[in-house]
Amino acid sequence: MKNRIIIPLDLDHINALNIAKTLDPKICRLKVGNQLFTSSGPQIITDLKEMGFEIFLDLKFHDIPNTVYEAVRSAADLGVWMVNVHASGGIQMLEASRRALEGYDQPPLLIGVTVLTSPVSYTHLTLPTSRSV
């Protein structure tokens, strides 16, 4: 199946693996975000890939160009299917992200996040600037 759905695994390691066991890698891909990757590290990618899944590593990298370059290379070295960066990091960071994938036979897809969405999508307009957060 070419257009597989992407299932977010916003869970802890054990529950993520238990959910993955109920899914078919032929019909879906899995998203590993900040919560799961921070708590489980690269092992979660290894475990899910061993089950046959393609992984979208959703960490929205955003830092100085060299740091993002290295982070994107590390993601590619893990063998993820797709990785993202936050586009607000600027053109140099975006170009570094693209360069990081040069030389890979099958590099992950690289996508840019332009705006974060949430149920309250206008929170960035109401941030308190006159007091400590």
What feature does the model see in each segment?
Residues 53, 106-108:
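A short helix->loop->beta-strand "cap" motif at the edges of active sites that frequently abuts
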Residues 68, 95-96, 121-122:
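Short, well-ordered secondary-structure micro-motifs
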Residues 109-116:
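Non-cysteine beta-strand/loop elements that form the S-adenosyl-L-methionine
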Residues 1-57, 61-91, 125:
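Conserved N-terminal beta1-alpha1 strand-loop-helix module at the mouth
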